[in-house]
Amino acid sequence: AFYPILIGLGAVGYMLWKDFDIQVFSGITFSWHMVFWLVMAVVFMFGRDIGYIIRIRILSNNQLSWRQAFRVIMLWEFTSAITPSAVGGTSVAIIYVHKEGISVGRSSAIVMLTSFLDELYFIVMFPLLILIVGPSELFDVSTSSGVLTRSLMGIALTGYFLKLGFVLVLSYGLFVNPRGLKWLLLKVFKLKFLRRWYHAAGQTGTDIIRSSHEIRRYNYKFWLKACSSTFLSWSSRYLVANALIMAFFAVSDQFLLFARQLVIW
């Protein structure tokens, strides 16, 4: 797991060295305020990965050790960073978890649950932040007209309801009728323009059935811990940008910064 870290640090170091411009830094006045928020950005980065590590241990019922969980998350993050967003690290995460001695069925369940919890975080947080910040503030751009603001709101709501639909369908498959969802997937992907992904849809349906058998055994304490670690990881991820902006600019509305990042995601 240390090789991906070294490769990543080496690549970042090279890009910083290549693009370094002393003239840019000459206009920055360093202060204890800046140092504090830069340190906080690093703390939030650690919080993000610690949340992921805690969560994957919880999802494995502590079958993964801390070291194994760290290794899986580092490989997962590295894969997500170097692959196209359409692929991401999720497609190979099952392999990483399985390599640590967990069965394929349980590995599928763990990875499926991480996706479910990630989407659930957005589904819950988006309306809460809309209530706190207000839609007019969230989508207002100083140079925009009312038409553009409404268009941005429409795009965000479309994305939200698509994610909500995904979560509802996945919830139905995981908790209610996994075989029925697999049957529906196969029917949909028999359509001519979707037929090329028919076998992949069948595999997804099989993964959902395997995952469902695992998930139905979990109690409310498990879900509370899993949701708490998800909240820690994703909130820390967004707060990194908040801290970096606070280091260089005077910003009063932290919720607005946080909410706009969530909408972009």
Residue ranges and their predicted role:
Residues 126-143:
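Transmembrane alpha-helix termini and helix-breaking/packing motifs in multi-pass membrane transporters
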Residues 48-56, 85-94:
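Transmembrane helix boundary and interhelical junction motifs in multipass membrane proteins
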Residues 57-61, 81, 93-102, 231:
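Helix-loop junctions at the membrane interface of multi-pass solute transporters
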Residues 75, 79-83, 106-131, 161-165:
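Membrane-embedded alpha-helical segments of transport systems
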Residues 1-74, 141-265:
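Predominantly cytoplasmic-facing regulatory/coupling regions of multi-pass membrane proteins
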Residues 67-72, 85, 89-90, 100-116:
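Membrane-interface alpha-helices at helix entry/exit sites of multi-pass transporters
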